[in-house]
Amino acid sequence: MAGSTAEQHGDGPLVGVLALQGDVREHVRVLQGFGARTRLVRQPKDLPGISGLVIPGGESTVMDKLSRQFGIAGPLRSAIDDGLPVYGTCAGLIMLADEIVDAIHDQRSIGGLDVSVRRNAFGSQTASFEVDLDVPALGDPPVHAVFIRAPVVASVGPAASALASLDDGRVVAVRQGALLGTSFHPEVTGDLRFHRLFLDMVEDAGRTL
């Protein structure tokens, strides 16, 4: 898969998965399970025709460098500004955030989502954890969430809304129009309601690049 942008054929919307680094395969599998067609996106030429995009978890600093190296960062921001639905998980949330409060030297985000995030807010890989989250927008039961070297939303701007928070009040899921972000990894738990929500957002947007 790493060397191909091949699409799955079907009747569902064509959803891209940013395939620079991270858990790309898991998101492709989930999206195809819902009947969506998928395309791996690495370069600007991969954007035309998609109706939505998932930015997977991984390492945000590496994604940032590669997105600039492959020339996709600027065109993707333009697509976001034009209303492309995008869902970012973990590092993908960092990439969508307008501000990274603890960015390393020269680290940038693509932006578009009116939030500030803090990287690795819960510690190292060994500090990963699981928790059940109340997500009113998704109803019952609670969402079982896995946090792996996860970011946290440090502040939510007026354009965005919090969808879920931990018991201590820290925000871990947000939405702003056609943009969706989670600190955790729904693709690894089997609770796929956030992906279903995103595909509903894609359908509601009714657009392609």
UniProtKB/Swiss-Prot annotation:
GO cellular component: cytosol; glutaminase complex
Residues the entry annotates as binding L-glutamine: 58-60, 119, 148-149
Signal peptide stretch: none
UniProt KW keywords: Glutamine amidotransferase, Hydrolase, Lyase, Pyridoxal phosphate
Pfam families named in the record: SNO
Keyword presence, Cell inner membrane: no
Pathways per UniProt: Cofactor biosynthesis; pyridoxal 5'-phosphate biosynthesis
Annotated EC: 4.3.3.6, 3.5.1.2
CDD domains, per database record: GATase1_PB
Self-association state and partner proteins as the record states: In the presence of PdxS, forms a dodecamer of heterodimers. Only shows activity in the heterodimer.
Function noted in UniProt: Catalyzes the hydrolysis of glutamine to glutamate and ammonia as part of the biosynthesis of pyridoxal 5'-phosphate. The resulting ammonia molecule is channeled to the active site of PdxS.
Family per record: Belongs to the glutaminase PdxT/SNO family.
Protein name in the entry: Pyridoxal 5'-phosphate synthase subunit PdxT
Lineage of the species this protein comes from: Bacteria, Bacillati, Actinomycetota, Actinomycetes, Micrococcales
